Design a protein with these regions (language model features):
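Conserved lysine of the Walker
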Residues: 21
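Hydrophobic positions on the alpha1 helix immediately C-terminal to the Walker A/P-loop
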Residues: 24
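ATP-dependent NMP and nucleoside kinases share a basic, alpha-helical "lid"
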Residues: 99-153
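Conserved nucleotide-sensing/catalytic segment adjacent to the nucleotide-binding pocket
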Residues: 38, 47, 51-95
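P-loop (Walker A) phosphate-binding loop of NTP-binding proteins
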Residues: 16
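Post-Walker A helix-loop "phosphate-sensing" segment adjacent to the P-loop in P-loop NTPases
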Residues: 30-38
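NTP-dependent small-molecule kinase module
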Residues: 1-4, 106-107, 147-150, 169-211
Length: 211
């Protein structure tokens, strides 16, 4: 891998639910060279609800800023910056809780943090060298979420739509969309905007000093 810089180059990728955040983050990692990139997903840092009954976990608002363990995420980013690997929690989307397993994230030249609220939380936002917001049409995002949650998370269309109306859309309007003003780069169409992603990658390579 070669010698790591004094501190990694941190990128925050935000946007609404199913806006293409993971697609863009993984594309950046692939094109920059995965050995250069540590990818951190905000979903891994949902607060631990293991002591609550499943019915209560089902009713939890996962789109509110209070749903995330910001101190743990900040501790992990500080450790990566100091050159230490970190045990990233793995989240179980079927049980609505941490699985108990972890994924070891290693220090890298570039650290990409992606999630709905990474530009909303001040303690996290101030760490980023580059802040990206994916501005994807709400209808497109809802369709993507329906397909994903039904296929991958054992949900029904009715429960997905109910959650969208009760928590996802209100949180987007109150927290996520307003955080766009903090972005250095706004990408329309999210992960489908290949030209914008290519330009972003070139800039990341330039700023981070990777080949």
């Amino acid at each position: 891998m070669g010698e790591l810089p004094a501190r990694p180059f941190l990128i925050g990728v935000a946007g609404g639910s199913s806006s293409g955040k993971t697609t863009v983050a993984e594309r950046l990692a692939e094109m920059a060279g995965e050995r250069h990139v540590a990818l951190i997903k905000l979903d891994s840092y949902y607060v631990d609800l293991g002591d609550r009954p499943r019915e209560e976990r089902l009713a939890f608002d996962f789109d509110h800023p209070d749903a995330f363990d910001w101190p743990l995420l900040n501790d992990h980013l500080a450790a990566l910056a100091a050159g230490a690997p970190v045990p990233v929690p793995l989240y179980d989307y079927v049980e609505y809780n941490r699985s108990g397993d972890v994924r070891l994230a290693h220090p890298a030249r570039i650290v990409v943090v992606e999630g709905i609220l990474v530009l909303w939380e001040p303690s996290l936002r101030e760490r980023f060298d580059l802040k990206v917001y994916l501005d994807t049409d709400p209808d497109v995002r809802l369709i993507r979420r329906l397909r994903r949650d039904i296929a991958e998370r054992g949900r029904t269309a009715e429960t997905v739509i109910a959650q969208w109306l009760e928590t996802v859309r209100p949180a987007h309007e109150q927290f996520i969309e307003p955080s766009k003003r903090y972005a250095d780069v706004i990408i329309p169409e999210g992960g489908l905007n290949r030209p914008a992603i290519d330009v972003l990658l070139a800039r990341v390579r330039e700023l981070a000093g990777t080949d």
